[in-house]
Design a protein with these regions (language model features):
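Cleavable N-terminal export/targeting peptides
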Residues: 1-36, 70, 92-94, 109-115
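N-terminal, post-signal peptide beta-strand-biased segments of exported outer-membrane/organellar beta-barrel
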Residues: 17-76
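Repeated loop/turn-to-beta-strand initiation elements of outer-membrane beta-barrel proteins
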Residues: 54, 68-72, 90-96, 136-143, ...
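Residues that define the transmembrane beta-barrel architecture of outer-membrane proteins
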Residues: 59, 78-82, 123-127, 157-165, ...
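Outer-membrane beta-barrel architecture
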Residues: 62-64, 83-87, 128-134, 164-170, ...
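Sequence/structural signature of outer-membrane beta-barrel proteins
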Residues: 76-78, 100-108, 146-157, 184-194, ...
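Detector for outer-membrane/organellar transmembrane beta-barrel domains
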Residues: 167-259
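Outer-membrane beta-barrel "beta-signal"
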Residues: 275-282, 288-290, 304-317
Length: 317
């Protein structure tokens, strides 16, 4: 089942990820906590209406543009037939179709030296759809549906046929020290495995720490149920800071931690760090290691390697 859950996450990211995520990854990993970021397109498809943009991570691309109506396209994986986004007014849609043909097995006789054996793999068919809408008095709503026909496919995925449903809601909600609420629900129903349900509820707020420095604090609750096994997580916490280092460079740090009430344990704090560079015509976002802070001058001026693990180049107009 762990393979199934990981596969679904990969498909949602690889099949319908239409925008830069490096900034969000460095700030805790949840795009919904940063409504102004283009990474929201993958959570709330209606966010495509806020941008004309083109970006790449060195392997894939995404571009969307338009005036009253937006259209966006991305390359996706080698077996993706189409990855499309659309937006108009307060609505948005992401659609992905993945089709990989069946490979028939070839078996060779022991005395046939010219024959090349081929391992047979079953065909793959994945339909991945997201719809989003901003509703007055309710907030931002995103709905996700995925239907797949997938089995062991060589070095790709090992995943049974099944269906995934998801719902995300974000709204302004003044409560205690927080300004916004985020609720998400996800249900994974593979044909031959136990269903998996995930439920999360978070409160978050942004902090004006100083000039050109913004912080985020989020706290929430999570519940996961897999067959007869359930796990309650509370509290889940995210703390992140983004600060202008110079007039063209931004430094980012994000920390997450969740406590399992069911197992009375935690994996501890998970840190992430990143940099953003504004080159005028485009923006470069990258994830970096914590050693950025041990020798910042040489790192930012290029005299020492940044040890960047991934990047995004984004152009907006």
């Amino acid at each position: 089942m762990k393979t199934i859950k990981n596969t679904i996450v990969l498909l949602m990211i690889g099949g319908l990820l239409f925008s830069s995520t490096e900034r969000v990854n460095a700030l805790g990993g949840n795009a919904a906590f940063w409504p102004e970021d283009e990474a929201n397109i993958s959570v709330f498809p209606q966010a495509v209406n806020n941008f004309n943009l083109a970006n790449t991570d060195g392997e894939d691309f995404y571009v969307s543009w338009g005036d009253d109506m937006k259209f966006g396209f991305s390359g996706g994986t080698s077996s993706d037939l189409v990855n499309l986004s659309w937006g108009m007014n307060n609505m948005g849609l992401n659609f992905g179709l993945n089709m990989t043909p069946e490979v028939e097995a070839v078996e060779c006789a022991a005395d046939d030296s010219d024959c090349v054996e081929v391992e047979g793999v079953e065909g793959v068919s994945i339909i991945n759809t997201q719809f989003g809408m901003t509703l007055d008095g309710v907030g931002d709503v995103g709905v996700h549906f995925m239907n797949s026909t997938m089995h062991d496919h060589g070095d790709h995925f090992d995943y049974e046929d099944g269906m995934t449903l998801g719902l995300t809601l974000r709204r302004a909600q003044e409560l205690w020290v927080f300004s916004h609420a985020l609720v998400n629900f996800n249900y994974e129903a593979p044909t031959d495995e136990d269903a998996v349900m995930n439920l999360g509820a978070d409160l978050f707020t942004h902090l004006d720490i100083a000039e050109n420095t913004t912080g985020l604090f989020a706290m929430g609750f999570g519940y996961t149920n897999e067959g007869e096994d359930g796990d309650i997580h509370f509290p889940k916490m995210t703390f992140a800071v983004e600060s202008a280092w110079t007039d063209w460079a931004t430094v980012r740090a994000g920390f997450t931690k969740d406590w399992s009430l069911t197992n009375t344990s935690s994996a501890g704090v998970t840190p992430n760090f990143g940099l953003g560079f504004n080159y005028g015509s485009f923006v470069l976002d990258m994830s970096v290691g914590s050693d950025i802070f041990t020798n910042p001058v040489q790192k930012v001026t290029g005299f020492d390697s940044l040890n960047a693990s991934s990047f995004n180049l984004t152009y907006m107009w």
